[in-house]
């Protein structure tokens, strides 16, 4: 493709301001920039900083290929997560979500207007939770809007037709949004969708691949809301790392201590435990999980941290688990490692010593784990995570259920957790699940290689926006 054709097109990425959304669009932005496109990434200032600081799997110098823009929004409260809240949904983020929904449109419109005068074409790739971006793109004669699907495409099948044959054939249960999200968040999403209804969208970009969700892709493409749209299944967006036994950190940067620790462990001997950036465990549950890890006698890396605040740079103070950790780390020295800060998840999952992943089942974590051939011990917390847990355990057959969603308000006892850990790490049935995850990982890797379906869809997307 001619260089002048690429340079005459601007891509504007507009993420929703939460970690699991920020990083997907930044991964896509880096992919597109690596192909020679001019890419602009627009978010509130703390979230631009957050996305840049937390991206991993790329050479840090790659960030220089992206132009970052601040979408200024009014001040908002950034409280700590409410550990006493009746719902596990991170409702403490709602002040920020509301401020963003109300105020991000104007600075985005100004940015798009400015870019539209400098480029032949502007392609706006927006998180589907930001439908106002499509409306603003439609005001410009030389702009197209493309929604980014940040959750599994199969989630749309459950949303549109919970009784669909694919769900019943595999025994998949779809929970309505208000069962696993707060009423305030559901109301915000529906309100934004209603306000922007009718905004033209040229297509849908998806962080998935046919190797994982091919059947569901075909079903969704035939549904009335999506008929006539172009579908680009370009996932996984996360980089696919090689076995990280050898250091991959660029010269001059320190390698995370957990990777050095993993280097000293036998192959496929370590359980990685992390529940993402929007979930907290109650102190009683932390104690039960700790007892299970200790009792299983399995090696582990455990990321023990609370959910992000709206502004992660407003966080301060030591971990609330500090007293517990001083004793637990002493008791498990040599067997496990606890991380209370940010962890390099992709590198951990790619490491040859890592055997499995105990996870909240966010779509990022799900696809990152499968793309590196690692099974998931499923512990869904909120939002689309119960659905991802269903997919992992029943459809992909690459997961083991730790806690069913209907028991999300209960403390899971150590004995039950330990049983699943031992099944995953020691049993024949666990070995079968691990083998299935490896097979899926190989299929996912093939999809992004030359000639793979995801590579073709990425090429088609670039070809369309630079036409």
UniProtKB/Swiss-Prot annotation:
pH-activity profile: Optimum pH is 7.5.
Catalyzed reactions: cis-zeatin + UDP-alpha-D-glucose = O-beta-D-glucosyl-cis-zeatin + UDP + H(+)
Biological-process GO terms, alphabetical: cytokinin metabolic process; protein glycosylation; regulation of cytokinin-activated signaling pathway; regulation of hormone levels
One Pfam family recorded for the sequence: UDPGT
Keyword entries, A-Z: Glycosyltransferase, Transferase
Tissues expressing the protein: Highly expressed in root. Expressed at lower level in kernel and cob. Weakly expressed in leaves. Weakly or not expressed in stems.
E.C. number(s) listed in UniProt: 2.4.1.215
GO molecular function: cis-zeatin O-beta-D-glucosyltransferase activity; UDP-glucosyltransferase activity
Binding-site list for UDP-alpha-D-glucose: 343, 345, 360, 363-365, 368, 384-385
Active site: 21 (proton acceptor), 127 (charge relay)
Entry binding sites for an anthocyanidin: 21, 91
Keyword ATP-binding in record: no
Annotated family: Belongs to the UDP-glycosyltransferase family.
PANTHER family referenced in this protein's UniProt entry, alphabetically: CIS-ZEATIN O-GLUCOSYLTRANSFERASE 1 (PTHR48044:SF64), GLYCOSYLTRANSFERASE (PTHR48044)
Function in brief: Utilizes UDP-glucose as the sugar donor and catalyzes the formation of O-beta-D-glucosyl-cis-zeatin from cis-zeatin. May regulate active versus storage forms of cytokinins and could have an impact on seed growth.
UniProt protein name: Cis-zeatin O-glucosyltransferase 1
Name of encoding gene: CISZOG1
């Amino acid at each position: 493709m001619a260089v002048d054709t690429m340079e005459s097109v601007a891509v504007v990425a507009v993420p929703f301001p939460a970690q699991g959304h920020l990083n997907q669009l930044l991964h896509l932005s880096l992919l597109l920039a690596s192909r020679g496109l001019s890419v602009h990434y627009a978010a509130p200032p703390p979230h631009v900083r957050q996305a840049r600081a937390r991206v991993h799997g790329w050479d840090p110098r790659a960030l220089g290929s992206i132009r970052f823009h601040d979408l200024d929004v009014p001040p908002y409260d950034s409280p700590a997560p409410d550990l006493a809240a009746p719902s596990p949904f991170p409702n403490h983020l709602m002040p920020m979500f509301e401020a963003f929904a109300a105020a991000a449109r104007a600075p985005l419109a100004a940015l798009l207007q400015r870019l539209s005068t400098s480029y032949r074409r502007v392609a706006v790739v927006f998180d589907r939770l930001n439908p106002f971006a499509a409306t603003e793109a439609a005001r410009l004669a030389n702009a197209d809007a493309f929604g980014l699907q940040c959750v599994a495409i199969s989630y749309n099948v459950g949303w549109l037709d919970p009784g669909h044959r694919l769900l019943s054939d595999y025994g998949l249960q779809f929970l309505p949004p208000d069962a696993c999200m707060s009423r305030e968040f559901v109301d915000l999403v529906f309100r934004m969708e209603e306000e922007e209804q009718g905004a033209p969208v040229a297509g849908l970009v998806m962080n998935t691949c046919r190797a994982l969700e091919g059947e569901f892709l075909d079903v969704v493409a035939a549904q009335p809301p999506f008929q006539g749209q172009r579908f680009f299944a370009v996932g996984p967006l996360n980089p696919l790392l090689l076995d990280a036994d050898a250091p991959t950190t660029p010269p001059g940067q320190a390698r995370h201590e957990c990777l050095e620790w993993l280097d000293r462990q036998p192959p496929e001997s370590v359980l990685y435990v992390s529940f993402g950036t929007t979930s907290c465990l109650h102190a009683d549950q932390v104690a039960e999980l700790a007892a299970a890890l200790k009792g299983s006698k399995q090696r582990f890396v455990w990321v023990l941290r609370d959910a992000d605040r709206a502004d992660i740079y407003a966080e301060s103070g030591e971990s609330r688990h500090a007293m517990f950790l001083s004793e637990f780390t002493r008791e498990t020295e040599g067997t496990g490692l606890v991380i209370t800060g940010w962890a390099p998840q992709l590198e951990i999952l790619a490491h040859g010593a890592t055997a499995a992943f105990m996870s909240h089942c966010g779509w990022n974590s799900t696809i990152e784990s499968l793309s590196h051939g690692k099974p998931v011990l499923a512990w869904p917390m909120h939002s689309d995570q119960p659905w991802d847990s269903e997919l992992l355990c029943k459809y992909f057959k690459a997961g083991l259920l730790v806690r069913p969603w209907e028991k999300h308000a209960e403390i899971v006892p150590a004995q039950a957790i330990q049983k699943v850990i031992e099944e995953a790490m020691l049993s024949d049935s666990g070995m079968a699940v691990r083998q299935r995850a490896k097979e899926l990982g190989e299929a996912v890797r093939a999809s992004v290689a030359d000639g793979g379906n995801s590579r073709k869809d990425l090429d088609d997307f670039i070809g369309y926006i630079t036409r």
